[in-house]
From Swiss-Prot:
Native species: Agrobacterium fabrum (strain C58 / ATCC 33970)
Protein name as catalogued: DNA ligase
Cofactor: Mg(2+); Mn(2+)
Domain (BRCT) ranges: 646-724
Entries under InterPro entries matching the protein: BRCT_dom, BRCT_dom_sf, DisA/LigA_HHH, DNA_ligase, DNA_ligase_AS, DNA_ligase_CS, DNAligase_adenylation, DNAligase_N
Record's keyword terms, sorted: DNA damage, DNA repair, DNA replication, Ligase, Magnesium, Manganese, Metal-binding, NAD, Zinc
Annotated Gene3D superfamilies: 5' to 3' exonuclease, C-terminal subdomain, 6.20.10.30, BRCT domain, DNA ligase/mRNA capping enzyme, Helix hairpin bin, Nucleic acid-binding proteins
Cellular component terms per the entry's GO annotation: cytosol
EC number: 6.5.1.2
Catalytic residue list: K129
Binding site for Zn(2+): C437, C440, C461, C467
Length: 724
């Protein structure tokens, strides 16, 4: 992974985009090792930390969410060894919760989404999260028909023969069971059975197994079911997939708790620690009780799962791309360890951010050898958080030679939590943060926030385009997959061209890419085709690929510019709104005047808030940016943006504002429905507003809409307009 880690809140658009690309590839690799080969390289806590980092970046930069995002995936593509089975209902994973605050946020989000429900009126179930292998067992006419692993959430592996060897799983259901029912749960190996198996393996002179989870997964994937039968696998049932009678959807209970009780009646093992509560405090207390009992359980668990109990509320809450809104997994804390800070090195990020990294005496944390830990910024070294609060006692600054507590949780690189002062060497010098960039030697400064007057927590290099650490990353972003995506011009090639000072080869800014062919043709000395790694055919392909990108989609061009806060989705919004690059650039220059119509129009675009708008305007106010763009546009023919078709929609292309207390749907539901019909939902009323939907308590927005002559309607009229 990249070493120049900085806190999510301090990432720039380019830094976030690059790290999301890394995380997508890294998580996919670990998924393949964990789900496909049962040979993980990292602990569950480390994997969760990677996912948390990915999710945190996506939450901070929603416009950068990738098509191959780990947040859209579940599990791993099924292996070809087993026949595939398509799940009748997807087997989604759960979002993770790591703290009391996260838990309370989850409960609050449920109430917020449902709306108009009194406190403590929603019941939640809480049960141990079994560290095993998720399974869906399908019964037809009450007989076990098939069994499939989760796989990628849509398609799993057919392990029916192996599942039949697990004695705890019924081969037939009672007469009151529906015609079709999918029972979902976790296959696991008990700790006692695992120890006995390893003892036998050792006695036989064979290699022992690493842990119960991997052993259970490997045992279930045996091609010979007789091997599986000898492994003493077990099962806990906890959820339903498809349920139907006579081809029509059916229910066996109205609550999650009732489903588990029905499983018990049918003969399935269910977890005895599952309970039902109505407050976040009760859930937290049960979480702590399970944590205390954890060492004495005969099975591995890595957290507690909370679910909204009523199935009708689950249906209203629905799903995100890969997880339900009505459930979360509260994970247990990661492990900590003690080690020594051997050195503190400075890494320079893509926009000049100077990030200190502690080089540590190697130590094993959670089954992984740790040698580095992020120190975030100068304040963190001193024990001060990003909001200015003290996170460690005043004399607990981090120094070279200190013995420190390291934890792997919540970040890709481990964090140094605290210092053991009693082990600090006499005369240990305080760490002095550098005042110059270690890459280019330019001054490094902490900018002052114009609104708050506070110093930024991040120290940045002022070198700009003269600093290699920044300029080369701008180029890599420009040619990245969601930007210009030029075949044959990847990160390795960009490094080569950027490092060259030969006028016939050098690429320092984006326009240089499109003049490379002409410079090569004019050169009598340096020919790219004669350089190692290139050839006549590959050079021709590269030039053809560059020429093919001269006619570029408008949203790709806008995204490629690397404007802070402008990701792929935001770029598409801007492209659809302005149509052509000429119109876009002209509008951005005009929007520098906050009293202008251009400023109002920019802010009215759904998804473009004031922070994004100001970042775009500041970008177009910088003369050096305009110089690069002018040279770039002379080499391109940007395409006009295509406008989406929403044929038949009465609100397609209209700008809609919702205000007041909505009673028939939540604000999120209203926005989602309007956008699905092609409407643009804005947060404020302007001359561009077409419809104002006003609920009880509508105030200034209704008054302004009336003043501007905007069409207004109540919820019933809105529902009648869009067809309910």
């Amino acid at each position: 992974m990249s070493k120049d880690q900085i806190p999510v809140e301090n990432l720039t658009e380019l830094e976030a985009s690059s790290e999301l690309a890394f995380l997508a590839a890294e998580l996919a690799r670990h998924d393949a090792l964990y789900h496909g080969k049962d040979a993980p390289e990292i602990s569950d806590a480390d994997y969760d930390a990677l996912k948390r980092r990915n999710d945190a970046i996506e939450a901070a930069f929603p416009a950068l969410v990738r098509a191959d995002s780990p947040s859209k995936k579940v599990g791993f593509t099924p292996l070809p060894t087993f026949a595939p089975i398509v799940h009748a209902r997807p087997m989604l994973s759960l979002d993770n919760t790591f703290s009391e605050e996260d838990l309370r946020d989850f409960v609050s989000s449920v109430y917020r989404f449902l709306g108009h429900l009194p406190d403590d009126s929603i019941a939640f179930t809480a049960e141990p999260k079994i560290d095993g292998l998720s399974m869906s067992i399908r019964y037809e006419n009450r007989k076990l028909k098939t069994a499939a692993t989760r796989g990628d959430g849509t398609t799993g592996e057919n392990v029916t023969a192996n599942i039949r060897t697990i004695k705890e799983i019924p081969n037939e259901l009672p007469a009151d069971a529906p015609d079709v029912v999918e029972v979902r749960g976790e296959v696991y190996m008990a700790k006692s059975d695992f120890l006995a198996l390893n003892a036998q393996m050792e006695a036989d002179g064979k290699q022992t197994y690493v842990n119960p989870r991997n052993t259970a997964s490997g045992s279930l994937r045996q091609l010979d079911a007789n091997v599986t039968a000898k492994r003493k696998l077990r099962f806990f049932a906890y959820a339903l997939g498809e349920v139907s009678n006579g081809g029509q959807p059916a229910r066996i209970a109205d609550t999650q708790y009732g489903i588990v009780e029905k499983f018990r009646e049918w003969g399935f093992p269910v977890n005895p620690l599952m309970k039902r509560f109505t407050s976040a405090q009760q859930l937290l207390e049960h979480y702590n009780e399970i944590g205390v009992a954890r060492p004495d359980l005969d099975y591995d668990i890595d957290g507690v799962v909370y679910k909204v109990d009523r199935l009708d509320l689950q249906e209203r809450l629905g799903f995100r791309s890969r997880s339900p809104r009505w459930a979360t997994a509260h994970k247990f804390p990661a492990e900590q360890a003690f080690t020594t800070v051997e050195n503190i090195e400075i890494q320079v990020g893509r926009t000049g951010a100077l990030t200190p990294v502690a080089r540590l005496t190697p130590i094993t944390v959670g089954g992984v050898v740790v040698t580095n830990a992020t120190l975030h910024n100068a304040d963190y070294i001193e024990g001060i958080g990003n909001s200015g609060e003290r996170i460690r006692p005043e004399d607990h600054d981090i120094r070279i030679g200190d013995t420190v507590i390291v934890q792997r949780a919540g970040d890709v690189i481990p964090q140094v939590l605290d210092v053991l002062l009693e082990k600090r060497a006499a005369g240990a010098a305080k760490y002095v943060f550098p005042e110059k960039c270690p890459v280019c030697g330019s001054h490094a400064v902490r900018e002052r926030n114009e609104k708050t007057g506070k110093l930024d927590s991040v120290t940045r290099c002022t070198g700009g385009f003269v600093c290699r650490a920044q300029a080369v990353e701008h180029l890599k972003h420009f040619v990245s997959r969601n930007a210009f995506d030029i075949e044959g011009l990847g990160t390795k090639q960009i490094d080569f061209f950027f490092e060259s000072d030969d006028p016939a080869l050098s690429i320092k800014t984006a326009p240089d890419i499109f003049t490379l062919k002409a410079r090569q043709e004019a050169s009598h000395l340096t020919k790219l085709e004669n350089i190692d790694g290139f050839g006549k055919v590959s050079v021709k392909k590269l030039f053809d690929a560059i020429d093919a990108r001269r006619a570029i989609d408008l949203h790709r061009l806008i995204f490629a510019l690397g404007i802070r806060h402008v990701g792929e989705t935001t770029a598409k919004l801007l492209a659809r709104s302005y149509g052509t690059y000429e119109h876009f650039e002209k509008a951005m220059k005009a929007a520098a005047d906050p009293a202008s119509d251009a400023w109002a129009e920019l802010n009215s675009i759904d998804g473009i808030g004031e922070v994004v708008a100001r970042a775009i305007i500041e970008f177009y106010k910088e003369p050096r940016n305009l110089d690069v763009i002018d040279r770039l546009i002379r080499e391109l023919q940007p395409k006009e943006a295509e406008k989406p078709s929403t044929e038949g929609s009465p609100v397609a292309g209209k700008t809609v504002v919702f205000t007041g207390s909505l009673e028939k749907f939540t604000r999120d539901e209203a926005k989602a429905r309007a956008e699905s019909l092609g409407a643009k939902v804005a947060g404020s009323v302007s001359k561009k507003t077409d419809i104002l939907v006003a609920g009880p308590g509508a105030g200034s927005k209704l008054a302004k809409a009336t003043e501007l002559g905007v069409q207004t309607m109540d919820e019933d009229e809105w529902l009648a307009l869009i067809g309910g």
